[in-house]
């Protein structure tokens, strides 16, 4: 382990000790905000410090074993020292790798809830139907994670599915698992409307946005145009006699969001503002990426809505993720929400890229 990393870990260990002392202070116990902040910092430090303590113990055992090998003449003790040395050398190597991975830059949004927007793209009715299939897939996956899902806005397709659907998923580390779903999802299958049984290729796009708080994304009221109108059901039929639906336009970016499924105009405005903050954040990130180098440092793919990320081939019961080259011959299970294999492969690829970048920076 290099000296800079070791020094940083020593600082973390001292900081954790100080936090533990502070959390016993009566004044801090009374200050809910400070208490919460310290507990969060403590949680972020505990695991890496625990591994560092294990690492230091293993290093001490190596020193002791070497001392025995240098000075001891008893063959039995020498043999035991050799075993101890081998075991702890392996342990140090493993712990160093674990610690270095834990110290890699973390995505600050990984802990957040998400807003997902699915749109039927190329392929007309079939694209809309597939957008509905993807929504169902994410709903089923959310159930396995004990996450809560809430539809924010939906436009039904004429033949089924959705031309657009926006929904929120709340739970533990949702963004960390679903952020790689952004992009174009391509489906190859025979549409129900196809009389001759020909395979058609259609596309639905997915955008996964972290939920942003008012503090993180500040939107000035004078940058908004807010229009109200009557909420309507399928076919444009009025289902509400009051102007409860809300359309908000963010004037600096031209972003428009609408909400009509809330119980009141106030609810719809809150929902629309939640969607707007996420979309303004997305626009800002895209702007920064456009200004950055062509080779992005932290991405498995670009995350752009237009980037083809996955193909779902129904006739062959096959799904391929093009970013990691992973093919699963169990499309039926994937569409039932079993997407963990893709998620794990993508997380591992992101980790691999971060390690490679870190090594490059250390050269």
Curated annotation (Swiss-Prot):
Keyword NAD included in the entry's annotation: no
Subcellular location, principal: cytoplasm
Subcellular location: Cytoplasm
Record-annotated disulphide pairs: none
InterPro entries noted in UniProt: PCRF, Pep_chain_release_fac_I, Pep_chain_release_fac_I_sf, Prokaryotic/Mito_RF, RF-1
Record GO terms (molecular function): translation release factor activity, codon specific
Keywords: Cytoplasm, Methylation, Protein biosynthesis
SUPFAM superfamilies on file: Release factor
Keyword field contains Protein biosynthesis: yes
Top-level taxon: Bacteria
Positions bearing N5-methylglutamine: 237
Modification comment: Methylated by PrmC. Methylation increases the termination efficiency of RF1.
Entry GO CC: cytoplasm
Family the UniProt entry places it in: Belongs to the prokaryotic/mitochondrial release factor family.
HAMAP family according to UniProt: Rel_fac_1
Role summary: Peptide chain release factor 1 directs the termination of translation in response to the peptide chain termination codons UAG and UAA.
Record-given protein name: Peptide chain release factor 1
Encoding gene (name): prfA
């Amino acid at each position: 382990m290099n000296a800079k990393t070791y020094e940083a870990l020593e600082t973390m260990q001292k900081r954790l000790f100080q936090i533990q002392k502070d959390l016993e202070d009566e004044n801090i116990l009374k200050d809910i905000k400070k208490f919460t902040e310290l507990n969060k910092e403590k949680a972020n430090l505990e695991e890496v410090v625990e591994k560092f303590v294990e690492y230091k113990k293993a290093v001490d055992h190596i020193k002791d074993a070497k001392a025995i090998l240098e000075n001891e003449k008893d063959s039995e003790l020498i043999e035991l020292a050799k075993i101890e040395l081998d075991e702890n050398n392996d342990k140090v190597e493993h712990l160093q790798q674990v610690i270095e991975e834990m110290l890699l830059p973390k995505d600050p949004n990984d802990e957040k809830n998400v807003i997902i927007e699915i749109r039927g793209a190329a392929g007309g009715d079939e694209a809309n139907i597939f957008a509905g299939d993807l929504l169902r897939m994410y709903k089923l996956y959310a159930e396995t994670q004990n996450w809560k899902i809430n539809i924010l806005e939906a436009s039904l397709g004429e033949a089924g599915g959705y031309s657009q659907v926006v929904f929120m998923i709340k739970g533990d580390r949702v963004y960390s698992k679903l952020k790689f779903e952004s992009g174009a999802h391509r489906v190859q299958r025979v549409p129900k409307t196809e009389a001759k049984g020909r395979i058609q290729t259609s596309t639905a796009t997915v955008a996964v946005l972290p939920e942003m708080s008012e503090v993180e994304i500040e939107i000035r009221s004078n940058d908004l145009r807010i229009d109200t109108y009557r909420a309507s059901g399928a076919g444009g039929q009025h289902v509400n006699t009051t102007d409860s639906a809300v359309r908000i336009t963010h004037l600096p970016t031209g972003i428009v969001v609408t909400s009509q499924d809330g119980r009141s105009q106030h609810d719809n405005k809150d929902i629309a503002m939640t969607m707007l903050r996420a979309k303004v954040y997305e626009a800002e990130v895209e702007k920064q990426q456009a200004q950055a180098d062509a080779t992005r440092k932290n991405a498995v793919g670009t995350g752009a809505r237009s980037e083809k990320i996955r193909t779902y081939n129904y006739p062959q019961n096959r799904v391929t993720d093009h970013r990691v080259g992973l093919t699963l011959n169990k499309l039926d299970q994937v569409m039932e929400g079993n997407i963990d294999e893709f998620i794990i492969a993508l997380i591992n690829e992101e980790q691999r890229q971060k390690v490679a970048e870190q090594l490059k920076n250390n050269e």
